[in-house]
Amino acid sequence: MAATLISAVACGGAPPFSGIECGTADERLESSYDASGRECVWNAYERGNAARWTLRSYTIEGDPIPTTLLIQPAGGIGLVVTRDTSADKFGGVGNQRVFTYRCSTMTKMPRRDDISRYSFILTNCTGDGPSTSVP
């Protein structure tokens, strides 16, 4: 463990993000909706630009689920979703961890109750599953 930490520090860690910052959203169940963050992400995706959006959603019990959606077209990285469910007290065995999906396709999915609002569906993924959604 110490060798890993020393190695990460010596190498400078992950390179800084270079792209469009689409902001940080805090969305409680159905009570808030970050339209500008979603539009920023969608516009970057359509134009092939790098972008990052950070979202904190919550379980029905109120446990936070931080999620990051990264669009990184350069170098073939594509779309990366990281979702941390480790604070989900009712998540069940094996589901309280960080999930990572590396995907090649993203589409908008209108909400049933309000078609002006949408989430993202990501498909053709590797990592923790073949698809995922971002609220």
Regions found by a protein language model. Give the residues of each.
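Bacterial lipoprotein signal-peptidase II cleavage site
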Residues: 12-19
